[in-house]
């Protein structure tokens, strides 16, 4: 069993917060790159997160983060050492998807931080990194080989005293259904490549499963099913290969993106048992009273490490795989036709972080059937902003399409389904949907999804609280004026986000 502490809570920089952070005196929800070092400390200190993701993928990041934290908060980090008690985990850029100009900068930060920590008598602060959009075993090893070469070069040419550690641990981030489903096969090949190069097999691995991009590209039914299959198969793999696997689940507060909020802790643990690290994104941390946030984090820390991992029989795995693949077709076919009518909303969507340009030389884009999509938070919030939660897209028709055996397995695998869609129905605005239908007939398919779910679960469609009523009224305004002034639409989207406690 690994002797290191495995973090239960990872704070992230996902820009899904509606409100200003609790530590932000200006009460502005936008968080500049210059404030993110202080943000990391506040999350360690005030919220007691175990780990904080430092994101280099498609955004600006400060390479001096460790130097700044040690210099400004020396007493705290003397007692709560990064790399031993608290963890700062870099998410590297994926050099197969973007130019990766800052990969060497990120890797160099590992080395200089180790030097600084050594001089202070601290533990090595940075020793593992996330590889986003991992597709193949050789990509995971490539990151380690590049780091090894850089560390050895620095030790030979620039270091006069102790040599740098020429090894980092990698956390593959599997983002789509196929890579999540086949994570065990990818990891098996990686372990062989690792042993071939380094002469030993890791005793443990942390494996990151995305909840947002899988929903964006294949729909909510496929995403939640894929996450469950991956968790179950990873724990099976751990037993077969005699290696400890600690799954990380990337989930936002919107149900479409995983549904983890301070109000849904039990639901999360029920749906994803076997996850050992949960991401608490910006909405979780900043869109609820701080006492509720602290309580939710404490509860997750108590429940995640001891939850009995999800077990799915081979027969049920086969059925769930078929369900995920079929449901993705309903989602994608409809989405292809909806995206053009959502462009004005996507463009007006408010920003919360310093991002690099999304496409072209500096970045990359997500796409479905060749159609470019915005990031998952923008996408999710945009559909909520027109009164149509994206969880419904394709879900109703896919559910109706299931035969008795498939339906039985799916219902058993998703115990919160009825409760989730009862909640989601309160954010549906049928008046707004009727207007959207007159502009684009593809919205009729989404209406069909909603009505099928209503017939099955007997829920009421529309708001049930004062805040939800305000949300519905604003959604109608957004639809009526969506091609008007973007500044006005942005203001409306911001207000709706505050009412539902997440931006997207």
From Swiss-Prot:
Which molecular function terms from Gene Ontology are attached? magnesium ion binding; phosphoenolpyruvate carboxylase activity
* Gene Ontology terms describing biological process: carbon fixation; oxaloacetate metabolic process; tricarboxylic acid cycle
**What cofactors does the UniProt entry give for this protein?**
Mg(2+)
Q: Where is the composition biased (Polar residues)?
A: 1-16
Q: What is its EC number?
A: 4.1.1.31
Q: Which UniProt keywords are given for this protein, alphabetically ordered?
A: Carbon dioxide fixation, Lyase, Magnesium
- Pfam families noted in UniProt: PEPcase_2
Question: Which stretches does the entry tag as region Disordered?
Answer: 1-21
Catalyzed chemical reaction(s)? oxaloacetate + phosphate = phosphoenolpyruvate + hydrogencarbonate
Subunit-level organization: Homotetramer.
Q: Relate the protein's function as given in its record.
A: Catalyzes the irreversible beta-carboxylation of phosphoenolpyruvate (PEP) to form oxaloacetate (OAA), a four-carbon dicarboxylic acid source for the tricarboxylic acid cycle.
Q: Which family does it belong to?
A: Belongs to the PEPCase type 2 family.
Q: What is this protein called?
A: Phosphoenolpyruvate carboxylase
Tell me what organism the protein belongs to.
Answer: Leuconostoc mesenteroides subsp. mesenteroides (strain ATCC 8293 / DSM 20343 / BCRC 11652 / CCM 1803 / JCM 6124 / NCDO 523 / NBRC 100496 / NCIMB 8023 / NCTC 12954 / NRRL B-1118 / 37Y)
Which gene underlies this protein? ppcA
